[in-house]
Amino acid sequence: GKVYLVGGPELGGWKLQSDPRAYALWSARQQFKTTDVLWFNFTTGEDSVAEVWREEAYHACDIKDPIRLEPGGPDRFTLLTPGSHFICTKDQKFVACVPGR
């Protein structure tokens, strides 16, 4: 699949942005497919990234029971299934929507 630098060069990697919608706006412009890879460029100890199960956990960025949580960076997530992948940490969040077959 294609490798996506999350946020693209314009956001400078996975870090807090002045606009909390920055990553959601970036994600809305992408056309993700299964086997695509999300590359989160951040430094270990400065950030983390989580994929959560439900939209409610996403909106609250509740990472107590994540699908996966990566405290060390940089990191990559492969989009293995169609559907909505809810990604968040702190005020950084977006949904990676992967169309079905």
UniProtKB/Swiss-Prot annotation:
The modification Blocked carboxyl end (Arg) is found at R101. GO terms for molecular function: electron transfer activity. The identity of the saccharide is not reported. The sugar attached to Ser-84 is represented simply as Hex. The keyword Signal does not apply. Residues 2-101 form the Phytocyanin domain. InterPro entries: Cupredoxin, Phytocyanin-like, Phytocyanin_dom. Keywords: Allergen, Disulfide bond, Glycoprotein. GO terms for cellular component: plasma membrane. It holds the Pfam family Cu_bind_like. Glycans are attached at N41, S84. Disulfide bonds join C61-C88. The modification Cysteine derivative is found at C97. PANTHER family: BLUE COPPER PROTEIN (PTHR33021), OS12G0150500 PROTEIN (PTHR33021:SF499). This is Pollen allergen Amb a 3. It comes from Ambrosia artemisiifolia var. elatior (Short ragweed).
